[in-house]
Every structure is written in structure tokens, then in C-alpha cells.
């Protein structure tokens, strides 16, 4: 579907399915709501899919790989060539995300949405990297829309193949710089308060990063009321691709798990494009990056994991999968009060 067609298919969650899922939880032979957020997230998934029965066995991590022109400003510890190296490691199951996917029984799909050179990673390339946002727009509006629609198309491929749960990941040297820029615009907060050290910058490197972001915002003057303009002016193709996945998941009734800081920026981008889309997103963890908790708060999300992670790739999102499996095992398998011959618990008044 096109971006506009996708937006038009996004509706509120199914209250009927959520009510049935809550009634199912309340009928299980245990204290009411004693599994806390684990109960809430399965009720949310019921609302997303419109079904009381929760099926999340077939799951995928979609990791969007892209390069960012702003690396010209010397804002990263690693060189741009690392993007392609790590992307190819996904295929060889050597990267962190690949190992975690194997452990969590998830399929990993790396996507070249805008790397500076071609690799063996499947190509859905919008361009060979973005332009340097510190000198002008990172991409055109047309490229921004194409990148969003690429994410939508990739997600729809997986949904058509039967995937019931998706997670978003990314790989792209310089993408904490673009993400910090977008976060500063969307949240209307000072750049220094939202910008972290990424993959490990020195204090001097962090100062260059902050200066580059402030310069990019000053030069491009992105309008926070137009999310696609914000993406085009100071964003990245990887962020756009992930946002497309969030939008497609919402349009097709498939839950999508958010990863860390960069994924949260993509989630907020999707929510600014289509507000109901945020109800279809599940937060996994709170990134170590300083803007992470502000982004989650803006989205009205509470994360499960607080591990001071800042690795990216979709690693935190994948770590949530086994937790969801355990919640679903109880939801599906535990005896009801009648089956256990226990008097039904009633809510306190």
C-alpha cells in the first residue's frame, strides 16, 4: 500500500477483543492482575489482532541498514564502512541481533534501505546514503515518502508470509546523530539534553555531535508539525523504514516491538503521521541514550527492560520475545478457577 492508503487503514484497537482477553486473565486461577504488565501487554495484543487467542510464534526482526551523510562532520567513533560490515554479519549470523534471534526463535531480515555501497544484504535502496544534514536537507520529501513506503512494503511482505509479531532494528553509522536531531525537533527540547555518546564518543566528539545537530536544525528549520518534513530535513532512511513497519503493523493488525532510542524516534515519527499507530506498538527497553525516557513518555509507553543498553540492531526488542512467550504460556495453559476448584477472586472495591 502507499503511505496514504496505509494511514487510512489505521483504526483504534478492538475494545471487544481486549475485554475478552481481560476476562480470560481474570478467570485464571491466580490473584487478579498478579502478572501486572505481562497481562496488560497480551490484552493489548488482543486489541491489535482483534482476537482473544494470542499467537506470536512466527516472529521477525526487520533491521534497516543505511548510511548518513552527517558523518562528514566527524560525529562518530567508527567510519561509515562499518555499516556495511555489520550488515553482512547479520547474514552470517555473527552480529549480536542474529545470535539473539536464534535464541528467541525469530527470523532476522536485514534490509539495505540506503547503505553507501552494495553488499549481499537484500536491496530496497532509496539512495546511497543521505546527504549531510549539517549543510542542507538529508533527503528530499519524495525520498522520505519512498523510504516510509519501503518500510511498509517490507512489513507487508512478512505479514503476507504469516508473521504474527515483528520487531524493528537498525544499523547505520551516524544514526544516533540523526535520531537526536529528530527528537530535539519533535520534543522541542535543547539538543545537548537529548544527545548522548552513541557508540562511544569522547567528550570532544560529543561536542562536535551536538554542534552538528544544532547547525542542521538551524540551517534546515524543520517544521515539527509536519513529520515528513522533519524526516526529510534531519532524518535517515533507516528511521523512515522502521516507521513504515510501525505504520504497516497498525494497518494490518500486527503488533510491532520497539527497540531502543533510534527505534523510538521512528515510533514517534509513525505516531505523528498516524496517531492511532502508537497503540499497536510495544515498548521493550529503555535505552541508555538520554532522550529515550522522554520519547517513551511522549508515546505513552512503559518499557519492560531497564538494562542500560545502547547497542541497537533490534537487540532489546528481541529480548522481549521470550518474556512475551512466558506470559502467553500462562495465558494459554493455566487452569481456570473452576478447573482448579478454587473460589473465584473478585476485584477489591
What are these model-predicted stretches?
Residues 2-349:
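N-terminal loops that bind phosphate or other acidic moieties
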Amino acid at each position: 500500500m502507499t503511505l496514504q492508503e496505509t494511514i487510512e487503514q489505521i483504526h483504534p484497537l478492538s475494545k471487544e477483543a481486549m475485554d475478552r482477553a481481560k476476562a480470560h486473565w481474570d478467570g485464571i486461577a491466580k490473584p487478579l492482575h498478579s502478572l501486572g504488565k505481562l497481562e496488560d501487554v497480551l490484552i493489548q495484543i488482543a486489541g491489535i489482532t482483534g482476537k482473544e487467542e494470542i499467537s506470536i510464534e512466527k516472529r521477525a526482526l526487520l533491521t534497516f541498514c543505511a548510511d548518513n551523510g552527517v558523518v562528514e562532520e566527524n560525529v562518530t567513533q567508527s567510519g561509515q564502512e562499518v555499516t556495511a560490515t555489520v550488515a553482512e554479519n547479520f547474514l552470517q549470523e555473527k552480529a549480536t541481533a542474529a545470535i539473539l534471534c536464534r535464541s528467541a526463535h525469530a527470523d532476522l531480515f536485514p534490509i539495505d534501505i540506503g547503505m553507501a555501497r552494495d553488499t549481499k544484504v537484500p536491496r530496497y535502496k532509496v539512495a546511497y546514503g543521505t546527504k549531510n544534514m549539517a549543510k542542507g536537507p538529508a533527503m528530499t520529501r519524495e525520498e522520505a515518502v519512498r523510504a516510509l513506503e519501503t518500510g511498509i512494503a517490507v512489513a507487508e511482505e512478512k505479514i503476507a508470509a504469516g508473521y504474527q509479531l515483528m520487531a524493528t532494528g537498525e544499523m547505520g553509522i551516524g544514526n544516533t546523530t540523526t535520531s537526536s536531531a529528530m527528537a530535539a525537533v519533535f520534543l522541542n527540547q535543547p539538543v545537548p539534553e537529548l544527545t548522548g555518546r552513541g557508540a562511544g564518543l569522547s567528550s570532544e566528539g560529543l561536542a562536535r555531535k551536538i554542534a552538528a545537530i544544532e547547525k542542521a536544525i538551524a540551517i534546515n528549520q524543520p517544521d515539527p508539525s509536519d513529520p515528513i518534513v522533519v524526516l526529510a530535513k534531519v532524518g535517515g532512511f533507516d528511521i523512515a523504514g522502521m516507521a513504515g513497519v510501525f505504520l504497516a503493523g497498525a494497518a494490518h493488525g500486527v503488533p510491532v516491538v520497539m527497540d531502543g532510542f533510534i527505534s523510538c524516534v521512528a515510533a514517534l515519527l509513525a505516531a505523528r503521521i498516524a496517531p492511532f499507530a502508537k497503540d499497536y506498538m510495544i515498548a521493550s527497553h529503555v535505552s541508555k541514550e538520554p532522550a529515550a525516557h522522554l520519547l517513551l513518555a511522549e508515546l505513552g509507553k512503559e518499557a519492560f527492560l531497564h538494562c542500560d543498553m545502547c547497542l541497537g540492531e533490534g537487540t532489546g526488542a528481541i529480548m522481549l520475545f521470550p518474556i512475551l512467550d512466558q506470559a502467553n504460556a500462562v495465558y494459554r495453559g493455566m487452569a481456570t478457577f473452576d478447573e482448579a476448584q478454587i473460589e473465584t477472586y473478585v476485584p477489591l472495591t
